[in-house]
Amino acid sequence: MAAQPSGETSDACCDGEDNEDREPEQLWQVAKLRRAAFSGVLLTASLVAAWAYPLWPVVLGLKALALAVGASTFVPSSLKRLAEGRVGVGTLMTIAALGAVALGELGEAATLAFLFSISEGLEEYATARTRRGLRALLSLVPDQATVLREGTETIVASTELHVGDQMIVKPGERLATDGIIRAGRTALDVSAITGESVPVEVGPGDEVFAGSINGLGVLQVGVTATAANNSLARIVHIVEAEQVRKGASQRLADCIARPLVPSIMIAAALIAGTGSVLGNPLVWIERALVVLVAAAPCALAIAVPVTVVASIGAASRLGVLIKGGAALETLGTIRAVALDKTGTLTANRPVVIDVATTNGATREEVLAVAAALEARSEHPLAVAVLAATQATTAASDVQAVPGAGLIGRLDGRVVRLGRPGWLDAAELADHVACMQQAGATAVLVERDQQLLGAIAVRDELRPEAAEVVAGLRTGGYQVTMLTGDNHATAAALAAQAGIEQVHAELRPEDKAHLVAQLRARQPTAMVGDGVNDAPALAAADLGIAMGAMGTDVAIETADVALMGQDLRHLPQALDHARRSRQIMVQNVGLSLSIITVLMPLALFGILGLAAVVLVHEFTEVIVIANGVRAGRIKPLAGPPKTPDRTIPG
C-alpha cells in the first residue's frame, strides 16, 4: 500500500511500492488501479470463458494472468520487506494467495489479488488526495516574477529570485516570495494564507508574504527570502516534519496492528497444524488461509493516518496550521482555554485615550517626558506614547526597573515613568481608577519626585472577541484570561469579552504555573503570541500561537498556529479537531469490529477466502472514505462584526 502520510510506513499494513513521483489527481492516474482494472478484466474473461466455452487451458491461463497482474501491486514489495525482516498485510495476502494456488483454488487466489490490488490503489489515491491539501500552499507561489535588473523590468523564474532583488508586483499578481514594500500602496488579499476574507492595507516598510494577491496598486518589493525559504515553504516544511509525531489513536492502532501480523501468522500455522492432525488437512489449511486474511489489520493501520492528513490539509487552507497527528488529537480533547490578553484578545495596537495632568503640567509636557523615556523602547505602550506626541528628545541614563517602569534624566532632571504603586498617584488617584475601569492601562509621569500626570493607554478588544468567547462557553469550554496588566484593567476588558475567570498582574512564570494548575484539572490549551508566552505555551497540553504569519518562532514554538489575526479561527480549529478525532475513533472501532467478526466466521468455515477478502477490503474503502471526511471544513463567514459597545473613559 501507499506510504503513510506521516512520512513513515507501517509494517503492519503498507507493503506497497513507493508513491509515484507525481501525485495522482484522477483515479485512472494511479498505476495500481490500472493494474487492478486489468486484473479484473482478465478475471471476468476467465469466468465468461468457463461458462460459454470451457476450454480449461484458456480459463486457467486467464486466471493465472489475473493473479499475476493483481499480485504485482503488492507481492514484490512484500518480498522485499520480508528480506529486510519485516512483515505486513501484503505478506499475509501473498501467503494466502500462494496457499490457495497450492490447494488448486486458482480462481480464489486471483480474486484475492484483484480485490486487494483495488484497495491498494484506492489507498494510494486517497493518501495523495489528502496530502495535496497541505502541499497546495506551495502552489500559491507563481512560477515567474518581475524584477528590476539595471533599471529594466525582467521576468525571471521564482526559483531564481535572490535576497535583495527588487520585485515589481502588478495589480492582480501574486507575490512570488516574501519581502518588504519599498514603494507603492495596495490592499493585499491574504485569504489563501491566513483564511481572512478582508484585504490588508499595506504600504512602504510593511512586510508582505509569498502567495498574497496584490490589489489595485503597483508595488516595488525588496526580496527578503528565496523561493525555497519563504514563509510558505517554511510552513510546509515545519508541519510535514512534525507529522511524524503520532497521537494516541495512531499509537493505539500501531500497537495493535504491528504485533498482530506475526501473531496471525503463528495462529494460522497452529490452526493448519492442529486441524490437519485432528481432521481433514485440506479443509483446515484452507481455513487457516482464510483466517490469515480475515485478521489482516490493513484498515486498522490506515484508520488514523488518512484522517490526520485530510484534517491537517483542510485546516492549512484556512490559515490554521496543526503540527502533526499528536497535536490534532490533543486539540480535539481540549476542554479549557487560557487566553493571553495582549495580542490575543486584543489587537496589540494600543493608543493613548486620555491624559490627566497636575502641578501645572500640560498634556504635551506629560507626553514629552513619557516619550523621552520610551524613545528607544519597542514595547507596544511605548509605540502608543510616541505616536501621541511630536516630541523627539530622548532621555539619558535610562534604566528599566523590572515590573515597575523606567527612570532616566531629561534636561538634567530626574524623570520617571511607571505603574501606580511604584509611583504615587496622589491627587490623580481617582483619575487613574477611572482609566483602569475603562479598560485602559494607566502609567504615571514624575519629574524630580513631583507628579506631572497620568496617561491612559488602551489596547482595544478584537471586534470578534466577545463572539468567540460566547461560542467557546456554549461549546462547553472553560475560558480563562491571563495578563500581566493590573486587576482593574483586566477586569474591565474581561467583562467586555464575557470572561468570568481572570488572573492579572502575572509574570511569565506565573502564567505557566496557572496553566499547569488548569491542566491538572482538564485538558488545557494556552493561546498567546508564541514568543512572549513561551513558558505558558509549554506548560499547557497544547500551545496555540495567534497571528503567527511571518513569525518563525511562533510557528516552531506552538503546536497549532493561527496564521491570521481573526480570533474566530480558534473555535473553528477546536471544532474541526474534535470532529476529526471522532472520525479517528470511528475508524479504529470499525476496523477492530470487522476483525473480531470475521475471525470466527473464517475459523468455522462460514466464509470462504473470496468473501472474507471482499468484506475486509470493503471495510478499508469505508475507512478511507470516512477519513477523507475530515478534509471538510467551512471557511469563516465574512469579516468579524464590530460590536456596539460604549466604554466610559
Q: Can you name each region flagged by the protein language model?
A:
Residues 136-229, 326-370, 409-410, 521:
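Conserved cytosolic catalytic loops of P-type ATPases
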Residues 90-97, 130-134, 143, 193, ...:
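Conserved catalytic phosphorylation-site environment of P-type ATPases
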Residues 170, 352-478, 487, 496-515:
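P-type ATPase nucleotide-binding
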